[in-house]
Amino acid sequence: MAAAAHDPAGAYDLLVIGGGINGTGIARDAAGRGLRVLLCERGDLAEFTSSSSTKLIHGGLRYLEYYEFRLVREALAERERLLRLAPHIIWPLRFVLPHDEGLRPAWMLRVGLFLYDHLARLRTLPGSRMVRLRTSPVGAPLQARLTRGFLYSDCWVEDSRLVVLNAMDAQARGAEIRTRTGVEAARRQGEGWIATLRDGASGRSETVRATAVVNAAGPWVSETLGGTLGIDSRAAVRLIKGSHIVVPRLYEGEQAYILQQPDTRIIFAIPYERDFTLIGTTDVPYEAEPGPVAISPEETRYLCDCINRSFARRIGPEDVVWSYSGVRPLYDDAAANASAVTRDYVLDVAEADGTRPALSVFGGKITTYRRLAEHAIEKLKPYFPGLAPAWTGDAPLPGGAMPGADFDAFLAALRREAPFLPDETARRLARAYGTNAREILRGARSLADLGEAFDGGLTGAEVDYLVRHEWARTPDDILWRRSKLGLRTGPDSAARLAAHLTRGRAEAA
């Protein structure tokens, strides 16, 4: 894909290590303030933790139990902001919280929801209220023993697409984004840093210079800090594995459920990709290498048991059509319980004689990524005199500049412009790309004009767009991170997609 013009001297203001939500968010913020930015990700964007979340933009209702009022307030403010800036990939969800006798008392739930409603200074989503589950349609999927509960609001997000959109906007503002490129080593030299990069495809090495380094390596933050950068730090990361399962749709309706468990944890059941239900997450301490991880049989059984405590329809491991796991790099606050570890973030700056800073990101949650990025650049501001002010709070993400942030109006307009699209395909394109969907459809007057047809409504035109503009190189990049069409793609279609990508690379060579 086309990259921003490369500085022939190999010099940058900021080298960002890591292409997850924090790395791309920081790169975007920095580039928009006028810094020369290089972001390196050794795999694909959002390949690990950032595509393995519960896919919620939320204040974190359960964090109130741990008195994290500042975190919840900040997250609620960001929820409102992001809903406005990316209405295609973020949308409101109504949650059902059943009162489960013997667990948290009803008064505690009421107090928590009252705080949740009122910690948000600005609120566009409906507030909480009590609901009688035996007479309300939202109670129909639940067991008869659950007679009352509460409704409240939060938001859904396409997590991996949020990462990609931040990278796209960073590049549009001058950043250079390199995927499949690892930072092998970086050391202070002269007035800045000198780093050795290795291209994962060609194996070629390259040396670049940067004034400052941001270590946003996620689960590898400590390894990168001590190994790649050669810096000792008192800040530590605590790795927590979280797993989710996807099953055929458990219930009718667009509401999600938040289910209390006897071990004090909560589990979400969320409508997913029209025909499925997403269930998660687990919280398991993790001490192995934080690479690709998979759900364990014990985690699968646990999540099924959690559903079977509350839903009338029972599920078992045989019902799972897909699962995913990720390792969350939380700041180690010495909490005894994995679920109690803070989701707040710590930004650790190591410098030498007041220069050559390296900022490392510990912890954080996807909801507050924009604020984290803003905070990170503010911490680096003393090293860049004349840096432009913060700007991301009012800037839509790519595809999100819809009048009034009105997704439904945009979808209706897209259907008028491309009446040949099946309704579901039009909705999927509008959700995934927002106003950029028009780039994929440019010049098309029929489905045939969009090129080769793959399963799930994917077309050659969409694939080519993803290769040109979104750093997609492999079928997995497209089927599991740029979309979730892997749930609808058979082996024959996947093989044709791989062949299409191979032909495209050969033609571009």
Regions found by a protein language model. Give the residues of each.
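Extreme N-terminal leader/targeting segments of oxidoreductases
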Residues: 1-14, 29-33
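Core beta-strand elements of the Rossmann-like FAD/NAD(P) dinucleotide-binding domain
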Residues: 10-12, 202-212
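Glycine-rich Rossmann-fold phosphate-binding loop(s) that bind the pyrophosphate
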Residues: 18-20, 42
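A conserved short coil-to-beta-strand element within the FAD-binding core of flavoproteins
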Residues: 179-193
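Glycine-rich FAD pyrophosphate-binding loop
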Residues: 31-51
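Dinucleotide-binding Rossmann-like beta1-alpha1 core, especially the glycine-rich loop
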Residues: 55-138
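C-terminal catalytic lobe of FAD-dependent flavoproteins
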Residues: 153, 159-161, 169, 228-279, ...
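Flavin (primarily FAD) binding-site architecture
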Residues: 215-230
